[in-house]
Every structure is written in structure tokens, then in C-alpha cells.
From Swiss-Prot:
Name of the protein this chain belongs to: 5-oxoprolinase subunit A
Keyword vocabulary terms for this entry: ATP-binding, Hydrolase, Nucleotide-binding
One annotated GO biological process: carbohydrate metabolic process
Reactions listed under catalytic activity: 5-oxo-L-proline + ATP + 2 H2O = L-glutamate + ADP + phosphate + H(+)
Length: 254
């Protein structure tokens, strides 16, 4: 059994280089919700050095709200914004001897694309037109995953170890009770359930089936690094290989 571990990096949380020793895929902020050119370059360089798969983490242009405020934009604006961010990170990756392998939207863009076909299609179209060999990371069982596959892209279904799920497979909004799970032992157990049993218990008690192909490790908490080490160790102890999806790795030629 195999699983990918990914983390959102370049967002000013301070533990990026160390997290890259634990994850197999890095989603690098492209400057619109956090980070900037220097942070992007640092993360790409470290990813190339450590053999971690490089991904773009585009968002709405909303640094004031860390990209977590939902926006209603024309599809053309979303398309252009995603293209813009992919171009920026791709240029830096090329200069550092790597290349982008995947794309994972951030925050509100991620959540809206997961349920809104119009937004999903705009994001997918931008990725496809930029480079149809790129894979996408999206919420397991979501509209976004379906849209990507319909467009011929490889879609990697993502699960969240420390987030609450609703019975329909969507994430509990951060503003609601049960959105974030702080108990580390509970998160470890949930991670193994999602990876081995292909299911997660919703906040209302139901078991929700899902196809876990990559697990997101959040890197923005005070204990994020230590906890990431526990999750990776638990997976390896359970005999699960931690490996990036696909053959395209940072620093390799396609």
C-alpha cells in the first residue's frame, strides 16, 4: 500500500525546510494569499535538493484573508489568475532545475472548486491549457476531481487528517464546531482509517467512503513539525510506503 504526504509551504510559517524532510509533495504558495518570489524560490530549491515533488498552490488574490474568504468572480478572472500563478512558480522551478508536477488550489478557491462546477472548470481549464501533463490534488469525491478527470488530467484524491468531515464528504467549515481536530492520537487513528480502510467518520457519526491518495499535513501550527513526524512514522510502522504519486519528481526531466 502506498500514500503521498503533502504540505502547503511558502506561507511564512517557518518550518518549510524541515517539513520537506517528511513530505513527498510540496504545494508552494504563489504569492496571492501568502509568500512571494523569495519564499517560492527557497521552497523550490529545498524541494529539488530533497527530491520532493513540486506543486503550485494558487489562490484568490486575497492576502488580507489568507485566501480563505469565498469570492464570486467571473470564470475568466479565475482562469487568468490561476494561469498567472502557475507561470510564476514554473519560471522559478525551471531556474532552480526543477519543474511543477501538480497543482492544488488553496483555501476558498479549493473549497469552492470542490463543489461548484463552474469554478472547477475554470481552474481545470487553466491547468490543462498551461500543461496537460500536470496532475491536480483535490478533495476526495469532489466536483473538482471529476472535472479534472473529464478534462483528461490525472486527479489525486486528497484527505485531511486534522479536519472534520460532513456526511456528504465535504469539510466542516472552519467557522463551525468540529472543523479542526486537535487531539493528536485521534488524528493518527483517522489517518490510518482513511489510508487503510478508505473511510472517515463524519462529525454526525456516519462512515464516509473515500479514496485516499494523498494526505495533507498542515504546517502552520506550533506543533506541526513534531506531529508530521508522528504521522509519517505511524504510516511507515503500518507498512505503508510514503511516496509521491506518479513518476514525475522534483528535479527530474519529464
Amino acid at each position: 500500500m502506498e500514500i503521498d504526504l503533502n504540505a502547503d509551504l511558502g506561507e511564512g510559517c517557518g518550518s518549510d525546510e524541515a517539513l520537506l524532510d517528511l513530505v513527498t509533495s510540496a504545494n508552494i504558495a504563489c504569492g496571492w494569499h501568502a509568500g512571494g518570489a523569495n519564499a517560492m524560490r527557497d521552497c523550490v530549491r529545498w524541494a529539488v535538493q530533497k527530491g520532493v515533488s513540486i506543486g503550485a498552490h494558487p489562490s484568490f488574490h486575497d492576502p488580507e484573508n489568507f485566501g480563505r474568504k469565498e469570492m464570486q468572480l467571473p470564470p475568466g478572472d479565475i482562469y487568468a489568475g490561476v494561469l498567472y500563478q502557475l507561470g510564476a512558480l514554473s519560471a522559478i522551478a525551471q531556474a532552480e532545475g526543477g519543474r511543477i508536477a501538480h497543482v492544488k488550489p488553496h483555501g476558498a478557491l479549493y473549497n469552492q472548486a470542490a463543489r461548484d462546477p463552474t469554478i472547477a472548470d475554470a481552474v481545470v481549464s487553466a491547468i490543462h491549457d498551461f500543461d496537460p501533463s500536470l496532475s491536480v490534488f483535490g478533495l476526495a469525491n469532489s466536483v473538482f476531481v471529476a472535472a479534472a478527470r473529464h478534462a483528461g488530467l490525472v486527479a489525486i484524491e486528497e484527505v485531511f487528517a486534522d479536519r472534520g468531515y460532513r456526511a456528504d464528504g465535504t469539510l466542516v467549515p472552519r467557522s463551525q464546531p468540529g472543523a479542526l481536530i486537535d487531539d493528536e492520537d485521534a488524528v493518527l487513528a483517522r489517518t490510518l482509517d482513511m489510508v487503510r480502510e478508505r473511510q472517515v467518520r463524519a462529525v454526525t457519526g456516519e462512515w464516509v467512503p473515500l479514496n485516499a491518495q494523498t494526505v495533507c499535513l498542515h504546517g502552520d501550527g506550533p506543533h506541526a513539525l513534531a506531529f508530521a513526524k508522528r504521522i509519517r512514522a505511524a504510516l511507515e510502522t503500518a507498512g505503508i510506503d510514503v511516496i509521491a504519486p506518479g513518476a514525475l519528481q522534483a528535479g527530474e526531466d519529464a
